[in-house]
Amino acid sequence: MSVEVTKLASGLTVVTDTMPHLETAALGVWAGVGGRDERPEEHGISHLIEHMAFKGTTRRSAREIVEEIEAVGGDLNAGTSTETTAYYARVMKADVPLALDVLSDILANPSFAPDELEREKNVIVQEIGASQDTPDDIVFEHLNELCYPDQPIGRSLLGTAKTLKRFDRDMLRHYLATHYRAPDMVVAAAGAVDHRHVVAEVAQRFASFDGGLAPKPQAATFGNGGGRVVHRDLEQAHLTLGLEGVPQADPSLFSLQVFTNALGGGMSSRLFQEVREKRG
């Protein structure tokens, strides 16, 4: 079987899917931390740290981080979600060690330079403004707030201008140290990779990550219902309906996913055919 899994002594998990016929590899680091791990005063810090990871380390400048990967024809990116933050790269097989070195460097040695931090805060404030000009974003932001009121899982990932203003280098370092723990991290690689080589590289380059456990996020509690209407000067109305689902480990989850696709998952779905095709 091409998929292999190894758990290091620190608790960090390494997963590979070897595809010998390929000449390239995709690899990344997934940390089990996201928006739902934030306290009210930390709202938006997970996403900010993801941005700041590319803004320089104690070994590389922001420019050197991207140039080292792009100089060998690769690309580098990241993303934050409610429950995870991912940092990933795609490179030729000979450059897998380089990619792992860069990924480990931006997480283990970020400089969080004050001037870069202030600049990136402003970038995210602009993101917030753009989101507020996008009806699709607005409607789901309000839906999440209603489904999970007064909970981190119900808040937007971007934070607010007020919370962003408070963040400084020490706050980012503390959050990184307490939430980016080896037992809650996975390094995954697929393509032209050798499992033993990847494990050896990861064991060396990610050795500085603490083996302790990160704080547990607040348990989610579904809201008591209700609705909200937000008026904007637009030509279309955007509607959402949220219902409580089942836990991820529930056996009926797969049936629910089939139902979701049948209802609105594609052009042949019930809602697509009824709303768009029949009613325009």
What role is predicted for each listed range?
Residues 217-225:
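Short proline/glycine- and acidic-rich turn/helix-capping motifs at secondary-structure junctions
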Residues 1, 224-227:
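Short beta-strand-initiation
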Residues 7, 15-18, 62-217, 229-230, ...:
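Charge-rich, well-structured scaffold segments of protease-associated domains
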Residues 1-10:
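Short, Gly/Pro- and small/polar-rich lid/capping loops
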Residues 11, 18-69, 180, 251-263, ...:
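Active/ligand-binding-proximal structured segments within catalytic/core domains
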